[in-house]
Curated annotation (Swiss-Prot):
Binds up to 2 Zn(2+) ions per subunit. It is not clear if Zn(2+) or Mg(2+) is physiologically important. Its EC number is 3.1.-.-. The lineage of its organism: Bacteria, Bacillati, Mycoplasmatota, Mycoplasmoidales, Mycoplasmoidaceae. Homodimer, may be a subunit of the RNA degradosome. The keyword tRNA processing does not apply. It holds the Pfam family RNase_J_C. Coiled coil: none annotated. Zn(2+) 2 binds at residues 85-86, 172, 399. One of its GO terms (cellular component) is cytoplasm. This is Ribonuclease J. Zn(2+) 1 binds at residues 81, 83, 150, 172.
Length: 569
């Protein structure tokens, strides 16, 4: 049973601390810390993609405040695999925290190097690749790995032996027993379990999905059938990060005498990195530039492109709008959607499919009748299998929203793990592991989300986002007041409204606001309560905003962004 930590019971004992910077009660920005005495090791540093209401924001990363404050303790960053929600925050981390060494699988290491090169002020000291047999040791920690099956090659779970017990972080995984060399290493998992797993930090993304997930082999067979029967060009879109599937699709295409055309930056980058490190064996002659596809018969072309989520600027959407410079869709084309819409993207994907349909193309989507996509995350029976193999003393669900975490708690109960031995946490909440027992502590680290705009990250962006949301919803209202050198208001304040309401249709209200603002400001000036011009200006702006806000809310039920400009001549 997980108990509350009582310092009086552990005088002279040093706890192993476990916490999440991000990745708990959410899907994205995965980042976890394990700390003992004078050492901190980090597992993953991901990004979370911004929702549509976060206007102008490219992504969200965890706060690194705890690491900045404890810089001398930071010893290493370990990466489970190369997906964006696990490595996308690394360049921003390297700008703020001195990381002595990053340990990563081959493809993740290559992707990180490329990211760092795009961020000139990110300082990378050292990056070391690891595999199934690697072991690393710090003063207090011993770390090794086990291979897992996921939608990207070189994916791993991480085992950390600490002075207070053994912690296993699952990484992202699934069981696909037809995956060959990329199959989850059950034998290694059993060996790790024999050491005793005291805390298992398990992903929970697909905890609500019953049964076992479909094998990728079924997906490949269905895609192969479509490719074989297609008489024209085949345009296939999937997640550019799903390198395992992309590799198989390329092999299927080559076996059907089709050249490969890569469209979209992330697709091009991921394929070329995979080729460079030997994960894809594709001859350069089998890849054609988009401007050259016209030189080949349509039946000999496969276009692999981005845009499976209906992204506006992605290659497939550009084609659907008839705006692509090199690819014009025609009725003989076949479109394969080898993906599912992520929650929040359903409308964008439906709109994309409607636009594609206008060209008369054949469209194949993933469905229960035709499987063209399988998730890379463990479903209920796969989670049960892993929990039975690991059989941890304590479980901390991660990598999922709260309802997913609660569901894996129920699954754990069915596997013999008691509810009181499962910790449903929040980001920033610190757990203590002492003598192989887990405790709730009162310690909290800062886990506020940090927003990214272009390549810049700042806590101040949260305030800017709020302003943008107000602008998009209620518009902007500006008040310009001109004073003479004796603080007398010259004329009537000028009012400007944008996106709030039509000024021409609201002349009486605009007149009322202008005169009320003038009277209110004059009463402030006449009170003579202020010792400095700065104090007076601050108070004038405050009462001006209050006055305008009152009238607009009362008459228009709007709450615009109010800007006041005070000028003295």
């Amino acid at each position: 049973m997980i108990k509350d930590f009582n310092p009086g019971d552990f005088i002279g004992k040093k706890p192993t601390k476990i916490y999440a910077f991000g990745g708990i009660q959410e899907v994205g920005k995965n980042m976890y810390g394990i700390e003992y005495d004078d050492e901190i090791i980090i597992i993953d540093c991901g990004i979370k993609f911004a929702s549509d209401d976060l206007l102008g924001i490219n992504g969200i990363i965890p706060s690194f405040e705890h690491l900045i404050e404890n810089q001398s303790k930071v010893k290493a960053l370990f990466i489970t695999h190369g997906h964006e929600d696990h490595i996308g925050g690394v360049p921003y981390l390297l700008k703020q925290v001195d990381i002595p060494v990053i340990y990563a699988p081959r493809i993740a290491a290559s992707l990180i190097l490329k990211k760092v090169n795009e961020h000139k002020d990110a300082k990378l000291n050292k990056i070391v690749t690891f595999d199934d047999f690697s072991e690393f040791q710090t003063k207090h920690f011993k770390i090794d790995f086990y291979r897992v099956n996921h939608s990207i090659p070189d994916a791993f779970g991480i085992c950390v032996q600490t002075p207070n017990g053994n912690i296993v972080q699952s990484g992202d995984y699934r069981f696909d027993f037809a995956a060959g060399s990329e199959m989850l290493d059950v034998h290694k998992v059993v060996k790790i379990a024999e050491r005793n797993v005291h805390v298992f930090m398990s992903e929970s993304t697909n905890a609500e999905v019953p049964g076992f997930s479909q094998s990728e082999k079924l997906i490949y067979r269905n895609i192969q059938k479509i490719l074989k029967e297609a008489r024209g060009r085949v345009i296939l879109t999937t997640f550019a990060s799903n390198i395992t599937r992309i590799n198989e699709i390329i092999e299927i295409a080559l076996n059907n005498k089709r050249k490969i055309c890569l469209l979209g930056k992330s697709m091009d980058v991921n394929v070329n990195i995979s080729r460079k490190i030997g994960l894809m064996a594709i001859d350069s002659n089998d890849i054609v530039e988009v401007r050259d596809i016209k030189n080949y018969p349509d039946r000999n072309i496969l276009i692999l492109c981005t845009g499976s989520q209906g992204e506006e600027a992605a290659a497939l959407n550009t084609m659907a709008r008839g705006k692509h410079n090199w690819v014009s869709l025609k009725s003989t084309d076949t479109i394969i959607m080898s993906s599912n819409p992520i929650p929040g993207n359903y409308a964008a994907v439906e709109n994309l499919l409607n636009e594609l349909s206008k060209f008369g193309v054949a469209i194949y989507e993933n469905s229960s009748q035709l499987k063209l996509h399988a998730s890379g995350h463990a479903t209920q029976q796969e989670l049960q299998l892993m929990l039975n193999l690991m059989f941890p003393k304590y479980l901390i669900p991660i990598h999922g929203e709260f309802k997913m975490m609660r569901t894996i708690k129920n699954i754990a109960n069915e596997c013999g793990i008691k509810s009181e031995d499962v910790a449903l946490l929040s980001n920033g909440q610190v757990m203590y592991l002492i003598d192989e027992e887990l405790y709730y502590s009162n310690e909290i680290i800062n886990a506020d989300p940090i927003y990214i705009e272009s390549h810049n990250s700042s806590p101040d962006l949260a305030r800017i986002i709020k302003q943008r949301q107000i602008l998009s919803r209620d518009g902007m209202f500006a008040v310009i007041v001109v004073f003479d050198k004796n603080n007398n208001i010259i004329g009537i304040p000028t009012l400007i409204t944008r996106g709030c309401f039509f000024a021409l249709d609201s002349n009486p209200l605009m007149t009322k606001i202008a005169h009320s603002v003038k009277r209110t400001l004059e009463s402030v000036i006449q009170s003579k309560k202020f010792n400095s011009h700065e104090q007076l200006t601050k108070e004038l702006k405050r009462v001006c905003k209050e006055t305008v806000s009152y009238f607009i809310w009362k008459n228009k039920n709007r709450n615009p962004l109010i800007s006041t400009v005070l000028s003295w001549i």
